[in-house]
Amino acid sequence: MGAAARSLRLALGLLLLASLVRPADACSCSPVHPQQAFCNADVVIRAKAVSEKEVDSGNDIYGNPIKRIQYEIKQIKMFKGPDKDIEFIYTAPSSAVCGVSLDVGGKKEYLIAGKAEGDGKMHITLCDFIVPWDTLSITQKKSLNHRYQMGCECKITRCPMIPCYISSPDECLWMDWVTEKSINGHQAKFFACIKRSDGSCAWYRGAAPPKQEFLDIEDP
């Protein structure tokens, strides 16, 4: 085999290796119910993005500067988080590394869940729950005040295909993907998984607070 042929095979091999490695570097997230996103987050706020700019956030292990996008925000309401209002949100500079793009100018309101960084700052990724406020159902908006918190000790298990089962009484089976082929179905929009007095968990529908009779039921 000639040198040119060997070089061509080597180049093709490197291209194949690159194509196999690249997906591992892309942003990949597992779907979560809005209640799970609320419970997993350090901070959950309703806010508008006022401005954005690229900033340095230290250096990597090779000494290269780490770039992040800084959003200056106007917080409208905090549903979960520190006593101090959030003033700045940080994210990666590209969606390929899970960076989030927000509309700036202060017109579009978002529900934003993410990780606290202290001193009025938080960090968000595409794996966090960030949606336009006006896309939330009335039930979701009301559940942010208290109901989601009532079920943070429960486990929401996503059903990817039938059959699927719960393995313990403190689980709620999330069926939206099976029934509607969507992760933003009826259970996401209108239900919360609530812990009851016997320690079990069950789906509760509606915007009104759960009645004592629901909390006291022993069998889901």
From Swiss-Prot:
Family label: Belongs to the protease inhibitor I35 (TIMP) family.
Keywords: Disulfide bond, Metal-binding, Metalloenzyme inhibitor, Metalloprotease inhibitor, Protease inhibitor, Secreted, Signal, Zinc
Annotated Gene Ontology cellular component terms: basement membrane; cell surface; extracellular space
Record field: transmembrane: none
Inducing factors: After intracranial injury, expression peaks at 4 days post-injury and slightly declines at 7 days post-injury.
The protein's name in its UniProt record: Metalloproteinase inhibitor 2
SMART domains registered for this protein in UniProt: NTR
Ranges of residues in domain NTR: 27-152
Location(s) in or outside the cell: Secreted
Entry binding sites for Zn(2+): C27
